Structures are given as structure tokens and as C-alpha cells.
């Protein structure tokens, strides 16, 4: 049954809608999955994934392909790279995450502070000159595609921003939720509404997603902090769902997509924890990220296919380097196994090969792994 979302409206004063009954099955699956997951329900889990993985993914959604190793190096020593724009977008998110971990109230003043952190040294002169005390003071055009034939979208008119942002804060801070999954749904409705308003000229998407993370932290819905990872793996669907919700005022499909994508990421996290338990020492961030990417692969897993996936999400590397840096360490630790070589070669001396997760070493609860191919 479709019902009105209370507290938020369009710029034409019409309602947004959602079909909660349609969402109940996936919500129930998530609650069942999380029932026995003690580690994922801790603040330390959130802090761990926010350290570098979420920084990478939140920027990756916007089309930036920073390698996880480089992100960690910049976080440790922000003078280690000369590219000022790259350094700023990484350090800004890292500092923004530190800010929301303080659990301060999500308010107009605190959001202003967060936005200053996230946008530092990233805005154009025009953007800076046309910013009001809190929000943009001019129209903004939103391009979801490089195709010039597709007309840009627009944020709401500047004179309406204040009213809609006040509704946004009231909606987020009006606490009626009973479960962590309810808080996740609310955070993603707010995520959409923020993008719909588009209160700034730039950095709206990163701010929307970071503020949704803020709501999750504030309400101790810690497992869901990884939702950006799901978006990062399905960016085209993400932007299509935003446009569909804008055109129909119905958020059901958008929220259903985000519930399913975060369920996949939680399953991967469960598998990752089981893998970690088989090792004598903790895996590196690079190894963890590689395993998570492997779990995202559909169909046959080969060196060439993994290279293609890696180069879609990172600064490009040669297939030989990817084999040596990403896959060989996992082969040595018996986390993945080489099944067979293929007819193709990746250079004059190396053959492409099929690999798989070493399931013999994993004691997985099959009831918890329903969406991920092992």
C-alpha cells in the first residue's frame, strides 16, 4: 500500500510516496541476518570501514578512482602527494567522517560546519562568490551523464532551499524508528531529499551520503554504515533510481534498491569476517578490498575479468601488476585457488587463468549468504 511520506514535500508542495509493504520482505531479511552479528553492531566496526574504504567509495561514486593504498598514505601523511585536488577530496572526507563521529546534532549550523570541511579547497570561484550564509544563492544544474543530448536536471529554486532544508532537519530528527533497518530507510529517504533539494553548487552527493551516515551513527545503526559500497558497485542504477524517484515522487524503488545493495554488502562483510578468522594475522586493507571486489564479480572469475573490474574503480594498472599485487598474495594465503589456465594470455610470458574462493576453508552459514556467488 502506497502512503505519503510525512514531513517532506516537493518544490510544488506535492507529496512524496513510499510502499512500505513492498519493502517489508527485504527489511525482514536484513533484521534476520543481523540478529546474531555482534561485531557489525559495534561502533568499532563503523570506524574501521570508515577509515579508508568508505572514503574511497564515497569519492568513487562521484567518478574519482583513487587507489586504497594511496588513500591510506594520504590519511597518514597528507603532504605525501602533490596533487592538491586529490589530497583535498580524500582528507576532506576523512575529516568529515571524524566530525560526524562526534555524534553532534544534525542541525543547520552543524551541517554548515560539515560542508565547510567536505568542500575545503574544492569549490570554484563562482561557487564561492554565489554562496549565501548557508546555501547556494543561484540556480544549479545537475549533469548525470556526459551525453550532451540529455538535458541537465535542476535543484530547487534558491528561494525555496531554506524551507525545504528546515523540513529535512525536522524529518531526520523526528525519532519514531524502532529498528536499525527503520533508521537505515529513514537515512536513505533523507539521502534522496537532500539530493532533490541540492542546496549547494557542488559536493551535494558526498554531503548527502555523509549526512545519512551521520544519522546512522547517531542512532547506532552501525552495520548500515557500509551502504556506499553497494552504491559504488552499481553507480548507473543509483543515478537512474534517483531520476526515477524525482520524476514519479515515489521513493519505493530507490529505497528497495538501497536495501538490496546493502544486504549484498553485509553478506560480503560476513564472508570477509569468516575468511579473516582462518588467517594467522589480519589481512591488509588491500587484501580485504580485493576479496570484496572478487565477491562482487558475476560469472566466471578470471585474471582478465578481475583486472577489468579493478581498473573501473581505481587508477589503471597493468594486468601483470594486478596479478602480483592483488591476486598472488591471496593465492599464497590460500584464500583463493587457481582452477585452470585459459587459452588466452595476458602477455608473452603469462597466461590468463580462472580462480575461485577457497570454499573448503570456510564454514559459512548458507542461510546468511543468499545474494553472493561463492
Regions found by a protein language model. Give the residues of each.
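FIC/Doc superfamily catalytic core
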Residues: 1-201, 207-374
